[in-house]
């Protein structure tokens, strides 16, 4: 009988060669073959290493930021959830894949029963015994039309999409930590600038007030000087609050507090980032994990159509076992005590009020939805990269212009202060020079922050942030199908 069970399993695999999953065709990318061109864009540069393969330690030069990114990759809760989701979908795939194989189980049982005389066929009371041992297969579905294989394929693609989702989460985390860090650094620089400016304003206010007491400055001059002081105090409180909130944001991203032994940060205007090559739009289809995730979900929806189609056809399940049955435990495995059971069952759908057709329509609609999501993901990626490329050149020009503006305001401030001290110009001109310089310095810090975050977002948009070191892409194998 054991040979019969083996033959049955082999027959099931031979019969189960039909699949109703539609042939998969990758949708055309609904974007241009080249990045936008124009006055706002620099010529795209080629490089030996794509941005997605550039390690974040090589991209970010600030040792303090590198330390924070490493901390976040260990402790961040969103990344932990993404990893657990990956494990969960892997387990679900293994559960579904198990339905491809017959579940073989062994059972053993024994019973003793006393039968009273009035219930016995012989008219006498007695004790009956029965022992059994069986090995068999229970309700194994012959996958003649590929329903189980379609569901297994769907589970596999869902699992693979979760792997790409985990990559997306890490890439987003690296960019978020970098942007939060640069915001923290910029707000600290603004706070320090405001603190120094407030001291200057207070000195000017005290000087103007003393001048008013001796009749040199007017009450209007005193009022204007005080206005500048109070305005700086408003900024002082604002940046003090922002610095504290920046620390709180970083703490959440890190999953723990900022390390006490944090490395010394680079200055905000130092060489913070490496150059990232844009490559071609077709490259992001292979390197952006969110695009890969969307395609795996599309393949999962495509596989589900096969399962919905298979539901229209008969399903056959088999139950079979072989074993021994004996009233005496000692003779359970003796010759002549063998027993077997073979119980096929067929289920043929006849009338279901259109539910099977509706299920098939639903699965096709879900595929169309996933096609649209896949195309939208590509379009979003194209926009993000295009925005980053436009920002690269324009921010360079904007920053240079802002530096020139700061220099011009510093010259204006020095001249206005000198002329005010010797009594040529009024206090109003001096206060105007102070305000203009303060505003220009704040704008320079803000523009530098915007430039840094734009480059970080471009690195993220190109798929960068998954590898710690450049060159790891060639060392790591692609995701493997999990084994039982």
UniProtKB/Swiss-Prot annotation:
PANTHER family listed in its UniProt record: CATION EFFLUX SYSTEM PROTEIN CUSC, OUTER MEMBRANE CATION EFFLUX PROTEIN
Protein name per the record: Multidrug/solvent efflux pump outer membrane protein MepC
Coiled-coil region: none
Any one Gene Ontology BP term: response to antibiotic
Lipid linkage positions (S-diacylglycerol cysteine): 18
Lipid moiety-binding residues (N-palmitoyl cysteine): 18
Signal peptide: 1-17
PROSITE patterns membership: PROKAR_LIPOPROTEIN
Pfam families xrefs: OEP
Alphabetized InterPro entries for the sequence: OMF, OMP_efflux, RND_efflux_OM_lipoprot_NodT
Domain of life (superkingdom): Bacteria
Membrane topology note: Lipid-anchor
Cellular component GO terms held in the UniProt record: cell outer membrane
Gene: mepC
Molecular-function GO terms, alphabetical: efflux transmembrane transporter activity
Function per UniProt: The outer membrane component of an organic solvent and antibiotic efflux pump; confers resistance to toluene, hexane, p-xylene, ampicillin, penicillin G, erythromycin, novobiocin and tetracycline.
């Amino acid at each position: 009988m054991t040979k019969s069970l083996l033959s049955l399993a082999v027959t099931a695999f031979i019969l189960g060669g039909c699949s109703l999953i539609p042939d998969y065709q990758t949708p055309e990318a609904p974007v241009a073959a080249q990045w936008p061109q124009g006055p706002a864009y620099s010529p795209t540069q080629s490089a030996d290493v794509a941005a997605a393969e550039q390690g974040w330690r090589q991209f970010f030069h600030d040792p303090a930021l590198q330390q924070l990114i490493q901390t976040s990759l260990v402790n961040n809760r969103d990344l932990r959830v993404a990893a657990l989701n990956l494990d969960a979908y892997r387990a679900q795939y293994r559960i579904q894949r198990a339905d491809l194989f017959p579940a073989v189980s062994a059972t053993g049982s024994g019973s003793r029963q006393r039968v009273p005389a009035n219930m016995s066929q012989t008219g006498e009371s007695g004790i009956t015994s029965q022992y059994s041992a069986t090995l068999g297969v229970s309700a194994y579905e012959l996958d003649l039309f590929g329903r189980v294989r379609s569901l297994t394929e769907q589970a596999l693609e869902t699992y693979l999409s979760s792997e790409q989702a985990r990559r997306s989460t890490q890439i987003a985390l690296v960019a978020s930590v970098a942007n939060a860090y640069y915001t923290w650094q910029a707000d600290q620089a603004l706070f320090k600038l405001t603190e120094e400016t407030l001291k200057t304003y207070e000195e000017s206010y005290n000087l103007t007030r003393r001048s008013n007491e001796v009749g040199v400055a007017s009450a209007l001059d005193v009022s204007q000087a005080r206005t500048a002081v109070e305005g700086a105090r408003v900024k002082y409180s604002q940046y003090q609050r922002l610095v504290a909130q920046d620390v709180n944001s970083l703490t959440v991203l890190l999953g723990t507090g900022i390390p006490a032994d944090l490395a010394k940060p680079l200055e905000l205007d130092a060489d913070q980032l490496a150059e990232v090559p844009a490559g071609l739009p077709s490259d992001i289809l292979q390197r952006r994990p969110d695009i890969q995730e969307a395609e795996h979900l599309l393949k999962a929806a495509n596989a589900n159509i096969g399962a919905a189609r298979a539901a229209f056809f008969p399903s056959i399940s088999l139950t079979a076992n072989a074993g021994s049955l004996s009233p005496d435990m000692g003779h359970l495995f003796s010759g002549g005590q063998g027993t077997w059971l073979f119980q096929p069952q067929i289920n043929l759908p006849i009338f279901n009020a259109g539910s099977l057709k509706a299920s098939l329509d639903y699965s096709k609609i879900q595929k169309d939805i996933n096609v649209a999501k896949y195309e939208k993901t590509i379009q979003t990626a194209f926009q993000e990269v295009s925005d980053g490329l436009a920002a690269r050149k324009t921010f360079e020009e904007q920053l240079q212009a802002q530096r020139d503006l700061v220099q011009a305001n510093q010259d204006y401030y020095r001249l206005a202060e000198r002329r005010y001290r010797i009594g040529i110009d009024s206090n109003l001109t001096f206060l105007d020079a102070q305000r203009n310089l303060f505003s220009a310095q704040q704008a320079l810090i803000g523009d530098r922050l915007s430039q840094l975050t734009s480059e970080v977002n471009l690195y993220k948009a190109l798929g960068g942030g998954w590898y710690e070191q450049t060159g790891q892409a060639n060392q790591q194998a692609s995701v493997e199908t999990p084994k039982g």
